[in-house]
Amino acid sequence: MSLPKIAISVGDINGVGIEIALKSHDEIKNICSPIYFINNELLNSAANILKFTVPNDFEIFECGSSFNIKPGRVSKKSGKFSFVSFENAILYTQNKRAQALVTMPINKESWKKAGVPYVGHTDALGKYFGKNAIMMLGCEELFVALYTDHLALKDVSAKIKAKNLALFLVDFYNSSKFENIGVLGFNPHASDNETIGGKEEKEIIKAIKSANNRLKKEVFTGPLVPDAAFTKSSLKRCNRLVSMYHDVGLAPLKALYFDKSINVSLNLPIVRTSVDHGTAFDIAYKGKAETKSYIEAIKFAIKLCDY
């Protein structure tokens, strides 16, 4: 039986992505057939800096132009290349040439310098496919979906409306099939019965009721108190959570499971997973990059595509 084909965009070439790909290749080729979206000249330049040998079976899809790699630096050229790699990998997967897409980390500032009109991978995928892409991060022990992802904190409250949140919850259930999902509150202590704010919690309660009614079962509970939801005893009861705001969900997740967590884009017509870390410019090309999150992302992508 042939192995599933996985399209891998290499991320920001000035970061740790290509080091992780080269380090992990011998392991992941046993569970999938990876194809890396990079040109030969850039690949060899990166390998030379790392003092790595490119494996003979390291299959690439030639894309983008070459330039001088500047380890650990924000760069317009590296931003443009990381988007070209990503865009080609999307098309390759969309055209059924690969069963799933796995992305290495990009640098958002480099994308901005290059004129890329998206905040990040999830935003780009949602707009590309015309869908409300859902960002979910974590591992089997704990998954957290973000109702708002890369949105300034001052703008989050205005986004918490029952109608839109209910649609999000239903989409999240339909794309994840999790049966027990906790929805975190927005205010401290989930407003403590409206003694600390509370208008957001009112909307959350309405959304939970609406989503459960549409699904005709009690999938969602809440609003849960965020500072208690991540304790060991709480996670034994419910370890699939929805956070209204990026840091409320991801700070405890990364404190607990940083090394093994991954990023998954749900509610899309393709399977996409990613590492749950950034470009790590501080250790780029120093041989220190960890591979565990990437390997977990590959394994989860294979699981999702039911190959």
UniProtKB/Swiss-Prot annotation:
Similarity comment text for this entry: Belongs to the PdxA family.
A GO molecular function held by the record: cobalt ion binding
InterPro entries documented for this protein: PdxA_epsilonprot (IPR037539), PdxA_fam (IPR005255)
Enzyme class: oxidoreductase
Subcellular location: Cytoplasm
Residues noted as binding a divalent metal cation in the record, renumbered to the chain: 150, 189, 246
NCBIfam families, A to Z: pdxA, PRK03946.1
Gene Ontology CC terms: cytoplasm
Enzymatic reactions: 4-(phosphooxy)-L-threonine + NAD(+) = 3-amino-2-oxopropyl phosphate + CO2 + NADH
Protein EC: 1.1.1.262
Pathway: Cofactor biosynthesis; pyridoxine 5'-phosphate biosynthesis; pyridoxine 5'-phosphate from D-erythrose 4-phosphate: step 4/5
Gene Ontology terms: biological process: pyridoxal phosphate biosynthetic process; pyridoxine biosynthetic process
Annotated protein name in UniProt: 4-hydroxythreonine-4-phosphate dehydrogenase
Residue sites binding substrate per the record: 121-122, 254, 263, 272
Residues in coiled coil: none
PANTHER family cross-referenced by the UniProt entry: 4-HYDROXYTHREONINE-4-PHOSPHATE DEHYDROGENASE, D-THREONATE 4-PHOSPHATE DEHYDROGENASE
The entry's keywords: Cobalt, Cytoplasm, Magnesium, Metal-binding, NAD, NADP, Oxidoreductase, Pyridoxine biosynthesis, Zinc
Record gene name: pdxA
Cofactor: Zn(2+); Mg(2+); Co(2+)
Further details from the record: The active site is located at the dimer interface.
Subunit structure: Homodimer.
Purpose of the protein: Catalyzes the NAD(P)-dependent oxidation of 4-(phosphooxy)-L-threonine (HTP) into 2-amino-3-oxo-4-(phosphooxy)butyric acid which spontaneously decarboxylates to form 3-amino-2-oxopropyl phosphate (AHAP).
Highest rank taxon of the organism: Bacteria
